[in-house]
Amino acid sequence: MIPGEIIAASGDIELNAGAPTVTLEVSNTGDRPVQVGSHYHFAETNAGLSFDRAAAHGKRLDIPAGTAVRFEPGQTRSVTLIPLSGKREVYGFRQLVMGKL
């Protein structure tokens, strides 16, 4: 072993394995880009994003931790969402929940 060496196990790692998913079409109706991070409560994203917010309630993007998705002005794209896990409490963001989901 070399100091700092990483020895990874063989095989692939599947992110969020087994989590139920929902796919939504999202449009940026604003005139500025909007970037949404991996663990942001998607239903509370920027009001310039147009999508089914009720379907996004309690969900986050199905992307690796620490990454984000960017929506350019006028852009429409599909995103896959998974349920927030853990205690399923949401505080902050746009202050639409402020407690248990």
Swiss-Prot record:
Keywords (alphabetical) are:
Cytoplasm, Hydrolase
Q: Which GO terms describe its cellular component?
A: urease complex
- What is this enzyme's EC? 3.5.1.5
Name one process (GO BP) from the record.
urea catabolic process
Q: What is its main location?
A: cytoplasm
Its pathway?
Answer: Nitrogen metabolism; urea degradation; CO(2) and NH(3) from urea (urease route): step 1/1
Q: Which reaction does it catalyse?
A: urea + 2 H2O + H(+) = hydrogencarbonate + 2 NH4(+)
Q: Where in the cell is it found?
A: Cytoplasm
Any Pfam family matching the protein: Urease_beta
- A GO term for molecular function: urease activity
Q: Does the keyword Membrane apply?
A: no
Assembly state and interactors?
Heterotrimer of UreA (gamma), UreB (beta) and UreC (alpha) subunits. Three heterotrimers associate to form the active enzyme.
Sequence similarity: Belongs to the urease beta subunit family.
This chain's protein is named Urease subunit beta
Organism of origin is Rhizobium leguminosarum bv. trifolii (strain WSM2304)
* Name of the gene: ureB
